[in-house]
Amino acid sequence: VKLLTFSILAAPHSTLLLKTLIMQYRNFGKLNWKVSEIGYGMWGMAGWSGGEDKETEMALDRSVELGCNFFDTAYAYGAGKSENILANLLKRQSGKRLYTATKIPPKNHEWPSIKGSSIQDVFPAQHIIDYTERSLKNLGVETIDLQQFHVWEDAWSNEDEWKLAIEKLKKEGKIQGMGISVNRWEPNNCINTLHTGLIESIQVIYNIFDQNPEDELFPYCEKNNIAIIARVPFDEGSLTGTLNAQSTWDKGDFRNLYFCEENLIPTLERVRNLSNELPNNMTLPELSLRFIKHHPAVSTMIPGMRKIRNVENNMQIGSDKNEVFTEEILAFTRKHRWDRLPTKWSH
């Protein structure tokens, strides 16, 4: 750990107060990296509306200043644009050890993966190699710290196609580790694949609503020293408390699909119920991150952040030992678990 001094906004229109914080780091599975408890999810840098490049650069630089060292992107985020943004960060922060994680898109362009699809249709060996080479170029690095499959079906666990490809990439030094980003609300759709010993990390949706990774996936990963990257900590934005029934997004923004009326209305009701009982003067975003932080299986979480104020607020959560998250508060969050099954809008 290291001491970090930075300023946060105590209240609207107040002066900046200086606080000395210690960014907390956790072990990243068998790779033995020390990664910041709060990482950086970069989907919103290229795949969502509302991001401006200069503001993006400032937010990324601020995160590094505050101790963030894990950055998750994907080729599919703007067809390499998000990877290019990360490449520029690596150049600007060349003196820092920053960990790069990206993802290989499915060849058939299906998110999530389709049950019964073949590995040859989704991740043939040459496709894995070709897109790793593209990402290496986009990122401007010789080695990708963590390459990941952007979708997955556990039925592919015994296929040699993907195994031979990642063994080749590791042997050639093109990647250090390999991970899987599991489909939404299918946290166990990877367990048999983990038995192969070839996967170093799992990226999974885990938040106050989506707690089911704790049932089977987390215990397995803890026992076998597999890193967990918790994604979608704010349920695509609902757990920030900023959405309402009239919320809209630009054409092409994923949230138009995810927050269709079928999902938005019950989500807002659950957010209201949660917000009405917030403990210890916590904000909803703070509670959301502290809930994820409480679980020892989680190596890092990757909220999306495009504003400096959000970077500062989120990094602050990664800089304490979470003593304020008591057993009583944990029991409170348990009441808000929401088990859901994949559907047409839950890509």
Mark where each language-model region is.
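Short, Lys/Arg-enriched N-terminal segments with co-localized hydrophobic residues
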Residues: 6-8, 12-22
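N-terminal binding-site loop/beta-alpha segment at the start of enzyme catalytic domains
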Residues: 19-98
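N-terminal small/glycine-rich loop or linker at the start of catalytic domains
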Residues: 30-48, 101-119, 148
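Short, well-ordered coil/turn segments that N-cap beta-strands
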Residues: 34-38, 67-69, 94-98, 141-145, ...
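Short, acidic/polar
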Residues: 51-63, 123-138, 185-192
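Beta/alpha (TIM)-barrel catalytic core signal, keyed to glycine-rich beta->alpha loops juxtaposed to Asp/Glu
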Residues: 152-344
